[in-house]
């Protein structure tokens, strides 16, 4: 009679999208998972995000996608305009149908809180031990354990995942000599949510929100993006422009008149949206140099999401790539049952994921360059190429519709990639 195989135990530090993805994926493979979130509860924080087919196919696999449909903005069009609204540079009609038919998965716009709530519910339903108010005080790399603040509880695992975000304390503990403090990029973001019910006095603006589309305005050192969430009942609007926050300040309440002055002369329709903003915060955009490694030398600690590869938002891949991380890690762990093989799994995980996310981060910087061009010969050449579609031999100025980059981004199947790695490395 064969012996019963005991499941491995994954301890996840951080209840964001990377941590939740890893927890769900690992439970679906039959292993145990404990997820530690230091906040006392999962509050409605954040704003909009864009779920591209590389992540929605994962959410479908995990049994989450259908729970989100009523909360999604499903855009039928993606448009890029000159900042002043004088010219449409690119327009892709039937965006929802194109994404579904080309990638067999949808492109949805979503409020982060709705996505997180659905993933927390799914994780709990699957049996993940989700703990809130659980702050990690220290880690024991020799014993593969974490010690919780306050109670001093020692939580033993077989493998530990640091998914505690850009300002990860776990990263600093694992790699104290790397000098991994995030650095300012020189840009900031105004993040705005406008409710449809508050725009009824302007039928044109209300119609924009009620009929979900994705819209970019591109200008000198700045651009704006707007899309509907929550079934077309809210508009998520983000303004990206040069950073003027004081040193040491990462987030602050913004002055409305200052914000409007920054975008004076832009598309009158965009400015009308800004006239309806009652309060707004501005967030400093941070980045971090590529890390030489994600795995601790012990072989039993690794990282995912912003804790190891924060990326700028110009391709909207931060959340999507974090979910890819979790999917790959969970699938790879599903291929083993002995804790002694975890170092091999983590080595494959790092090899698979690191090269992809580093390329995405570089492509996001390219997108920033192309969307923030000042008026002049380069901008005129960009506009001409975009409007005449004479970009076939190289990457498009807008990677959102680029026939080279879009399939590489959206066609990625994290589960298939992990399965291929298992077959090729004989994990």
UniProtKB/Swiss-Prot annotation:
Signal peptide: 1-22
InterPro entries according to UniProt: FAD-bd, FAD-dep_Monooxygenase_BioMet, FAD/NAD-bd_sf
PANTHER family in alphabetical order: MONOOXYGENASE (PTHR13789), PUTATIVE (AFU_ORTHOLOGUE AFUA_2G01680)-RELATED (PTHR13789:SF238)
EC number: 1.-.-.-
Binding site for FAD: 37, 112, 306, 319
One Pfam family per UniProt: FAD_binding_3
Gene (name only): OpS4
Function description: FAD-dependent monooxygenase; part of the gene cluster that mediates the biosynthesis of the bibenzoquinone oosporein, a metabolite required for fungal virulence that acts by evading host immunity to facilitate fungal multiplication in insects. The non-reducing polyketide synthase OpS1 produces orsellinic acid by condensing acetyl-CoA with 3 malonyl-CoA units. Orsellinic acid is then hydroxylated to benzenetriol by the hydroxylase OpS4. The intermediate is oxidized either nonenzymatically to 5,5'-dideoxy-oosporein or enzymatically to benzenetetrol by the oxidoreductase OpS7.
KO phenotype (gene knockout): Impairs the production of oosporein and leads to the accumulation of orsellinic acid.
Name of the molecule in the record: FAD-dependent monooxygenase OpS4
Family to which this protein belongs: Belongs to the paxM FAD-dependent monooxygenase family.
Record carries keyword Glycoprotein: yes
Induction record: Expression is positively regulated by the oosporein cluster specific regulator OpS3 that binds the promoter at a 5'-CGGA-3' motif. Expression is negatively regulated by the global transcription factor Msn2 that binds the stress-response element 5'-AGGGG-3'.
Transmembrane segment boundaries: none
Cofactor: FAD
Chain positions carrying an annotated carbohydrate: 54
GO molecular function, one term: monooxygenase activity
SUPFAM superfamilies: FAD-linked reductases, C-terminal domain, FAD/NAD(P)-binding domain
Pathway in which this enzyme or protein is active: Secondary metabolite biosynthesis
Coiled-coil residue windows: none
Keywords from the named record: FAD, Flavoprotein, Glycoprotein, Monooxygenase, Oxidoreductase, Signal, Virulence
